[in-house]
């Protein structure tokens, strides 16, 4: 059950307090102290309820109450506490001991609430305007950031390529001088082509003459061996030598060709002074065969007697092949 309010009792006075009532209440509280508000009306003889006595003391008669306008710090405290606690003005007044809960409530309803609503409306309008104005700027800022990031990535890639190139050059130090030498040779090759073209013919004739001199000496050595072996090889060698001599005569440099031909003619002259002829070349081979035949005469006689003259015919046929 809910307790009925004390103000509804018969004989209780309502309305504003008179100065005489204030003096009676203040003198009683100074003697007994604030508290036990139910006994105050009966003890003082006031025709007021206990609640009215408490509120009159707390909001108007107690010492240290600050009157007048609220400071900026007090306004911020009230706004912050009202957002946290709501309309609990007595709890809010406990954080501001110089202000009463009734004064805080009245000041909130008359000034702070309207002021706060106006500030919120202005802030919302500013936010809307800033959002509308910042939409193209934000897109441009994003595009600029993307462009700057792309440029930075390109720079990074180029720096990486340069670093790779420098690393490859550092790891292969022999490549750089080769490249420089090739560049210098290619630049100087165009200048030296004309000078080298004139000397190329002389070098070619010199090379052919030197190779021919060496080939004539080799042919002379081979001719000596061919003279001992068979006359057929000598004829073929003479033909080869004559054809090579003709080719040398057709060359450009006449002096070197004449010297080579002279060396070959001197070799031929020395060979003729030795008195060697194609008929005489095969005779030493026959004498060697005859000497070998005298050594094996006893064996041949025995074979001739045994085979009935067949060996003699074979030996005569073999000797005829040497002629």
Curated annotation (Swiss-Prot):
The N-terminus (11-116) contains a fully active minimal DNA-binding domain. Ubiquitinated by MIEL1. Sumoylated at Lys-283 by SIZ1. Stabilizes MYB30 and is required for its function in ABA signaling. Transcription factor that binds specifically to the DNA sequence 5'-AACAAAC-3'. Acts as a positive regulator of hypersensitive cell death. Acts as a positive regulator of salicylic acid synthesis. Regulates very-long-chain fatty acid biosynthesis. Acts cooperatively with BZR2 to promote expression of a subset of brassinosteroids target genes. Transcriptional activity and hypersensitive response control negatively regulated by PLA2-ALPHA. Involved in the regulation of abscisic acid (ABA) signaling. Disruption phenotype: Altered brassinosteroids response phenotypes. Hypersensitivity to ABA during germination and seedling growth. Changing residue 232 to R: No effect on sumoylation. InterPro entries: Homeodomain-like_sf, Myb_dom, Myb_TF_plants, SANT/Myb. Residues 130-148, 182-200 have a biased composition (Low complexity). The gene is MYB30. Keywords: DNA-binding, Isopeptide bond, Nucleus, Plant defense, Repeat, S-nitrosylation, Transcription, Transcription regulation, Ubl conjugation. CDD domains: SANT. Residues 119-151, 182-208 are annotated as: Disordered. The modification S-nitrosocysteine is found at residues 49, 53. The keyword Transcription applies. Expressed in vascular tissues of leaves, hypocotyl and roots. PANTHER family: MYB FAMILY TRANSCRIPTION FACTOR (PTHR10641), TRANSCRIPTION FACTOR MYB30 (PTHR10641:SF1063). Residues 9-61, 62-116 form the HTH myb-type domain. It comes from the Eukaryota. Induction: Up-regulated during hypersensitive response, but no expression detected during compatible interaction with pathogens. Specifically induced in the inoculated zone 4 hours post pathogen infection. Up-regulated by jasmonic acid and salicylic acid. Transcriptionally regulated by BZR2. This is Transcription factor MYB30.
């Amino acid at each position: 059950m809910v307790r009925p309010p004390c103000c509804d009792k018969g004989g209780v006075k309502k309305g504003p307090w008179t100065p005489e009532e204030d003096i009676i209440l203040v003198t009683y509280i100074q003697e007994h102290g604030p508290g036990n508000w139910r006994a105050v009306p009966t003890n003082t003889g006031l025709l007021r309820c206990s609640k009215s006595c408490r509120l009159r003391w707390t909001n108007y008669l107690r010492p240290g109450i600050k009157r007048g306008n609220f400071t900026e710090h007090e306004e911020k405290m009230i706004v912050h506490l009202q957002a946290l606690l709501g309309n609990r003005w007595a709890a809010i007044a406990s954080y501001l001991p110089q202000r009463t809960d009734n004064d805080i409530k009245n000041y909130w309803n008359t000034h702070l609430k309207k002021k706060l609503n106006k500030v919120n409306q202005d802030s919302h309008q500013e936010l809307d305007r800033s959002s509308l104005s910042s939409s193209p700027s934000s897109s441009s800022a994003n595009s600029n950031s993307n462009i700057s990031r792309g440029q930075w990535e390109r720079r990074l890639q180029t720096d990486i390529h340069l670093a790779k190139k420098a690393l490859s050059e550092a790891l292969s130090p022999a490549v750089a001088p080769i490249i420089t030498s090739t560049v210098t040779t290619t630049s100087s090759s165009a200048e030296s082509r004309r000078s080298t073209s004139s000397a190329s013919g002389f070098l070619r004739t010199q090379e052919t003459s030197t190779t021919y001199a060496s080939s004539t000496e080799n042919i002379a050595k081979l001719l000596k061996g061919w003279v001992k072996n068979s006359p057929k090889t000598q004829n073929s060698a003479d033909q080869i030598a004559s054809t090579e001599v003709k080719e040398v005569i057709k060359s450009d440099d006449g002096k070197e060709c004449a010297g080579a031909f002279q060396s070959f003619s001197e070799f031929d002259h020395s060979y003729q002074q030795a008195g060697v002829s194609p008929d005489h070349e095969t005779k030493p081979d026959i004498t060697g065969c005859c000497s070998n035949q005298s050594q094996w005469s006893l064996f041949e006689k025995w074979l001739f007697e045994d085979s009935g003259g067949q060996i003699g015919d074979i030996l005569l046929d073999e000797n005829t092949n040497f002629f």
